[in-house]
A protein has these predicted regions:
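A short, structured active-site edge motif that brings together acidic residues
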Residues: 1-7, 124-127
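Beta/alpha (TIM)-barrel catalytic core signal, keyed to glycine-rich beta->alpha loops juxtaposed to Asp/Glu
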Residues: 45-186
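Active-site mouth loops of central-metabolism enzymes
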Residues: 5-22, 66-75
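Acidic/hydrophobic-patterned starts of short beta strands in beta-sheet-rich repeat architectures
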Residues: 39-40, 97
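Active-site acidic short loop of glycosyltransferases
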Residues: 34-35, 93
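Flexible cofactor-recognition loop at the NAD(P)H-binding site
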Residues: 5, 34, 42, 47
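Short, acidic/polar
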Residues: 14-32, 77, 82, 106-110
Length: 186
C-alpha cells in the first residue's frame, strides 16, 4: 500500500507529513483487515517535485531553470524517515519503499537513512517496460548502489505492449497501434 495522495480535503490528509503517514497507515491496516503491512510505499516525493518520469516537458524554450514554479515546502526527509522508522518499530510495517522517485531522491533518502541508522527504503517502484526504459540511465544504478530492489509498474505499457491497441482503427492511438503491430515480430 502507498502513502502520499490526498485521502480527504484536510491539509494533513495528503503528502508525507508524519501525521499523514501514521494516519494513512492506520487507515490501510483497517481497510486491509490486517495487523501489519509488508511494504509501505512513499508514492511520490513530497512537495510537488516532478520526477524525470513524471512530467516531461519537451518544449525546452518554455522551461525557466533559474525561476522554477512555486511549490509548497516539502516535508523534510528526517520527519518522513522518522515516521516510517516508528511504524517499523511498532510492527505496523515491515519495510518502507519509494515509488516514482528520481535517482537523486533515492540518494537523498538512503543517505539520510544511513546517517540516522534507520532501515530506510528497500525497493523503488518505477514505470519500466520495453517502451519506457529511462530508469536504466540513473535510477537502476542508484538502486544498485544503495541496495534497493526494483519493482516495475506498467510492464505492458498500459496495454501498448500487450496488443490492447490493436483494436483502435482511428483516433489518436491508431497510429501508435499500427507502429507497434508492424514492429511486433522484431
Amino acid at each position: 500500500t502507498k502513502v502520499h495522495c490526498p485521502m480527504g480535503s484536510g491539509v494533513n490528509e495528503r503528502g508525507l507529513s508524519a501525521f499523514h503517514i501514521r494516519q494513512a497507515c492506520e487507515d490501510s491496516l483497517r481497510r486491509l483487515k490486517t495487523d501489519h503491512i509488508d511494504v509501505y510505499f512513499m508514492h511520490h516525493v513530497d512537495g510537488g517535485e516532478a520526477t524525470p518520469l513524471g512530467k516531461i516537458n519537451f518544449n525546452l524554450p518554455d522551461v525557466d531553470l533559474f525561476h522554477p514554479p512555486h511549490r509548497k515546502k516539502a516535508t523534510q526527509w528526517e520527519e518522513v524517515l522518522q515516521a516510517f522508522e516508528v511504524l517499523v518499530q511498532q510492527g505496523k510495517i515491515v519495510y518502507s519503499a519509494s515509488s516514482n522517485f528520481a535517482a537523486w531522491n533515492i540518494a537523498q533518502v538512503c543517505e539520510k537513512s544511513n546517517s540516522r541508522n534507520f532501515l530506510g527504503p528497500v525497493c523503488e517502484q518505477s514505470v519500466y517496460n520495453l517502451s519506457t526504459r529511462m530508469i536504466e540511465l540513473e535510477l537502476i544504478p542508484a538502486c544498485r548502489e544503495y541496495g534497493l530492489g526494483l519493482m516495475p509498474w506498467s510492464p505492458l505499457g498500459g496495454g501498448l505492449l500487450g496488443g490492447a491497441l490493436k483494436k483502435f482503427e482511428s483516433g489518436r492511438r491508431s497510429g501508435l497501434a499500427e507502429v507497434v503491430e508492424k514492429n511486433r515480430e522484431q
